[in-house]
């Protein structure tokens, strides 16, 4: 499954919508997606959203869509 992860670059600064960034990743489930991001980055995760069907198609066509790869631990 493909997940869209909204995050802040670090956990120290309070989250602001204007500085929210996005990454796309593949994982078996939402828990695994969160674990992989937390284990491999200093990011403050705001939201993880599963992308399927029309949502996935839209993101591929209209966003800077690139899958980020993390090592599973």
UniProtKB/Swiss-Prot annotation:
One of its GO terms (molecular function) is DNA binding. Coiled coil: none annotated. It catalyses: RNA(n) + a ribonucleoside 5'-triphosphate = RNA(n+1) + diphosphate. One of its GO terms (biological process) is DNA-templated transcription. Its EC number is 2.7.7.6. One of its GO terms (cellular component) is DNA-directed RNA polymerase complex. Keywords: DNA-directed RNA polymerase, Nucleotidyltransferase, Transcription, Transferase. It is an enzyme of class 2 (transferase). It holds the Pfam family RpoY. InterPro entries: RpoY (IPR009907). A non-essential component of RNA polymerase (RNAP). RNAP is composed of a core of 2 alpha, a beta and a beta' subunit. The core is associated with a delta subunit, and at least one of epsilon or omega. When a sigma factor is associated with the core the holoenzyme is formed, which can initiate transcription. Belongs to the RNA polymerase subunit epsilon family. This is DNA-directed RNA polymerase subunit epsilon. It comes from Lactobacillus acidophilus (strain ATCC 700396 / NCK56 / N2 / NCFM). The gene is rpoY.
